């Protein structure tokens, strides 16, 4: 099988590759340094390799081409990147004073069709390869000239429909880029028969399941959840929560829950009370996300007072809660707004 990309290979794998080329193992270590520390983009740029090797047919490093970049007023960066097969994807860099979070995509498009999310409006093209996920982190690092501290799989796609490649990418981010696995979050809207298996696969392949799992609920009951998330019809609320309990038992890590707040639809104090009942016993954290508008839907962003009241109702019932600040709204880079659309940026 032809090598798809060098990016994503470990130092040991690159040393083996060097041996196969008749080179000493230290060439593999040098290549590892150029791929991950220096962020090499082109084969010919790796000047430590022998000239004769560099002049041969270039090997695929696995780096994307930047199509557009958009910088929001709050400093959030949105990049439109091109894949080798002519598709495109979006990734986002979210800076604060003491951290840089990269919001990565796991698929080109998304099949889940959540009504409040722009990505699902275009359907699924394909799942991303591990190197295409790692490349997003390297590209944001390169453009923003800052080392990413956190990675969240909250961009385009449903990570649990690409769990094999997602876990491979997480392994690379931890092993080769030195990221703490606890600073990596995998977000899912829920796919039947995948949550316990994700924990088992992480233990088998990574030796631990230390990344954070964030499960998107978005409603306090099955009926409303089905209205917002069509695929929820195949995944009863009770079964989703039971699978979350199994995940916790296997991984030893708590689950966090995400809840998008839609004005006058799922943001009442009564619904907050119902949500608190659903997550009772999880010792979990609920992350509230005020809706970020998209063109195709008429959902409303909730008034700040309703957001505060919803959060207060959860806290009164012993639920740890936070409200996510919307970042990159003026460039359609906020949660739920990614869609592979060219806007004429740099």
Swiss-Prot record:
Q: Which reaction is recorded as catalysed by this protein? A: adenosine(2503) in 23S rRNA + 2 reduced [2Fe-2S]-[ferredoxin] + 2 S-adenosyl-L-methionine = 2-methyladenosine(2503) in 23S rRNA + 5'-deoxyadenosine + L-methionine + 2 oxidized [2Fe-2S]-[ferredoxin] + S-adenosyl-L-homocysteine; adenosine(37) in tRNA + 2 reduced [2Fe-2S]-[ferredoxin] + 2 S-adenosyl-L-methionine = 2-methyladenosine(37) in tRNA + 5'-deoxyadenosine + L-methionine + 2 oxidized [2Fe-2S]-[ferredoxin] + S-adenosyl-L-homocysteine
Task: Write down the top EC class of this protein.
Answer: transferase
A Pfam cross-reference name: RlmN_N
Ranges of residues in domain Radical SAM core = 96-330
Q: Which cofactor does it need?
A: [4Fe-4S] cluster
Q: Give the note describing cofactor binding and stoichiometry.
A: Binds 1 [4Fe-4S] cluster. The cluster is coordinated with 3 cysteines and an exchangeable S-adenosyl-L-methionine.
Name the source's superkingdom: Bacteria
User: Single Gene Ontology BP term?
Assistant: rRNA base methylation
Q: Which GO terms describe its molecular function?
A: 4 iron, 4 sulfur cluster binding; metal ion binding; rRNA (adenine(2503)-C2-)-methyltransferase activity; rRNA binding; tRNA (adenine(37)-C2)-methyltransferase activity; tRNA binding
* Disulfide links within the chain: 103-335
Give an example GO cellular component term for this record.
cytoplasm
PROSITE patterns found in the cross-reference section: RADICAL_SAM
The family this protein is said to belong to: Belongs to the radical SAM superfamily. RlmN family.
Its function, per the record, reads:
Specifically methylates position 2 of adenine 2503 in 23S rRNA and position 2 of adenine 37 in tRNAs.
Misc remark for this entry?
Answer: Reaction proceeds by a ping-pong mechanism involving intermediate methylation of a conserved cysteine residue.
* NCBIfam families assigned: rRNA_mod_RlmN (TIGR00048)
Name listed for the protein in its UniProt record: Probable dual-specificity RNA methyltransferase RlmN
The scientific name of the source species is Synechococcus sp. (strain RCC307)
Q: Which gene encodes it?
A: rlmN
């Amino acid at each position: 099988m032809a090598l798809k990309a060098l990016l994503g290979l470990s130092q040991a794998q690159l040393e083996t590759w060097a041996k196969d080329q008749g080179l000493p193992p230290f060439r593999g270590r040098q290549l590892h340094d150029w791929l991950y520390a220096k962020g090499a983009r082109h084969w010919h740029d790796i000047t430590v390799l022998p000239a004769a090797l560099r002049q041969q047919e270039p090997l695929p490093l696995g780096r994307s081409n930047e199509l557009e970049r958009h910088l929001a007023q709050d400093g959030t960066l949105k990049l439109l990147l091109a894949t080798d097969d002519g598709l495109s994807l979006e990734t986002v860099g979210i800076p604060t004073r003491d951290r840089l979070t990269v919001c990565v995509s796991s698929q080109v498009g998304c099949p889940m069709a959540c009504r409040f999310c722009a990505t699902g409006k275009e359907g699924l093209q394909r799942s991303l390869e591990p190197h295409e996920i790692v490349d997003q982190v390297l590209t944001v690092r390169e453009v923003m000239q800052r080392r990413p501290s956190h990675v969240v799989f909250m961009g385009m796609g449903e990570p649990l429909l690409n769990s094999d490649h997602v876990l491979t990418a997480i392994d690379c981010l931890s092993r080769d880029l030195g990221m703490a696995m606890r600073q990596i979050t995998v977000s899912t809207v829920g796919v039947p028969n995948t949550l316990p298996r994700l924990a088992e696969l992480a233990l088998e392949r990574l030796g631990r399941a230390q990344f954070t799992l964030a499960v998107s609920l978005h409603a306090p009951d099955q009926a409303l959840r089905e209205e917002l998330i069509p695929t929820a019809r195949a995944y009863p609320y009770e079964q989703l929560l039971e699978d979350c309990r199994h995940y916790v038992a296997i991984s030893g890590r708590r689950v966090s829950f995400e809840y998008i707040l839609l004005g006058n639809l799922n943001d009442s104090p009564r619904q907050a009370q119902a949500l608190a009942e659903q997550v009772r016993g999880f010792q979990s954290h609920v992350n509230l996300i005020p809706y970020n508008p998209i063109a195709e839907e008429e959902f409303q962003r909730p008034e700040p007072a309703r957001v505060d009241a919803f959060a207060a109702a959860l806290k009164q019932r012993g639920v740890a809660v936070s409200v996510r600040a919307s970042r990159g709204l003026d460039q359609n880079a906020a949660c739920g707004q990614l869609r592979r659309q060219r806007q004429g940026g740099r």
